[in-house]
Amino acid sequence: MLAQGFEAWWPQSRLAVRGYVEVLPRLRELLAMRRALAQRLLAQPPDVFMGVDAPDFNLDLEVALRQRGVPTVHFVSPSFWAWRASKIDKLRRAADQVLCVFPFEPELLQAHGVPATYVGHPLASMIALAPDRAAARQQLGLDSQEIVVALLPGSREAEIAHLAPRFFRAARHMLGQRPALRFAVPTLPALRAQVQAAAQAAGFAPGDSAVQLFEGQSHGVLAACNVALVASGTATLEAALFKRPMVIAYHMPWLSWQIMRRKQLQPWVGLPNILCQEFVVPEFIQERAQPDALAAAVLDWLDRPQQAAAVQQRFEQLHHLLRRDTARLASDAIEKILRRG
């Protein structure tokens, strides 16, 4: 967005927090940020306000703006169908229009009096229907003949702290059985040292050829890999759009998990399973996310090529379902609101 000329009033990194307990140390800062943003927008009201995801931050802001006559659009519906049922009433008060990225959401929202439009998922248009593994490997410098396992332990410090040690110990287990495996790990510059420390703690010395880190190359790594071990979140959808069999894992502080599981409305956590409405890929959550179990599940995909091919076909169907002209559909919906106002 910055590259397109948008002005950043605060760096995105200050909003990069997920969970319940994890947000507490940042709560005062986040609330102050939202108050300052509301004051600024109310002092100079925009023609329309679009909140992008982040419902815990954006919905109260949208309510305040809408009460002052500012038309509001919310892009990416809260996951009320998974564990945010309580958000529907606030969403009704907050948004003149919700732009949904999943096809089943508009009907559910409209049944609760929330205007909603399906616009497709932006990632489905960004990612090629037939990813080129050979080209990705050439770009990353990975051998075309090796079996590559992608490790994606998350994009936040808390996720890395909880998952990277488990993922690298799982990699160590896998190497014990398949010494020729190679592991590709996308990371961000700000998280590289933390990821490297987790790798070293699992016994991977700096420069170990079995593990390679790639900064800002998550899509390249997913295109290049044979199978992925992925932290629950948007990265699981990305892996599905790249048609890669995967194992989903997540671990969070005990209290956050207790709160979340009491709100959980479906048996699945990973987006591919939620969208397919069945366990098409295995999930290992909390104490089930043990390194040996993760390793066994990843190797199982490599040992079952027919099952891997079947799940890739499911992911191809999913890709077509989510692939729409999102930018045009979203802009059309916003234009209608502007004309109406």
Give the location of each predicted region.
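Nucleotide-activated sugar donor-binding and catalytic core shared by glycosyltransferases
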Residues: 1-341
